[in-house]
């Protein structure tokens, strides 16, 4: 029995936590419908940041949360198009009309729905969207999504320069180069390379991947947060950063069939399971309370399971989903921000980004029908 499976088994025995392996599509639809009921402004085709609404806050959420929600809606439209395909179209229109800036030197999505001429743009926000647009195109074959993916990726790649030997900046102020702006850009480039046979995108992915490994990878295989233009490395290890490098290496393996890429992906995934698995619960929330980061690591583990058929990866994701459902869900089907132990203040508002991460996680598990962990 491998260490990860042993840990999950021990957690169940010691805590008495009954597995809640159930219909993940039902859970995904419940989470998605909760968001539509409590966060969505249908006339504006945009999402509010919290529920209950905070009267002191901006009326709509920032692009980071929208990006997570967009990925959840894309998955929803894949698995239940009759119910959610129109929502995908409407939400796409709402983002484009409110957040897309066609007047920028290189058009891209603003951080907030401030309209044309905005000066607050994040390269990472746009990189996540480029990946999502590519996914939407794969699912629907609607050329508008491929067009959006290419346009958005063009903006992200404009954030590269040779300061610090290369790399893409985090945002327009050009103060730091972050793993969260580089790793999803490399993955987006490879998705586009798969879809269009664009060799330039493959070249970009390889260049970004090389810079990341030489600049922001720790000896254990995991990735630090960022490096400032003064050369100072911020060494927090967010799970979503390593997750996107794992996905990048898996895409490289699919395109180039180099065993070293698959080995690198497995090494990072195994190091991540060791680093982020909470020994008290078996969840992936040892160092992070929020699912907004771990959902990306879960997706990376599922993609690695697809490639290797190693059940420790899917078992970890199932356990994470079941843990979140058990500790962070309220009786109405919404999710609290804290997935580590579910504790929250009585007056705490629920946030769009955490609920979107929950919905995305459950949608990711829909195609995996085996209800039992591999123990």
Which stretches of residues belong to each language-model region?
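Sec/Tat signal peptide C-region and signal peptidase I cleavage site
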Residues: 18-21
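Extended ligand-binding groove/face enriched in aromatic
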Residues: 85-195, 202-206
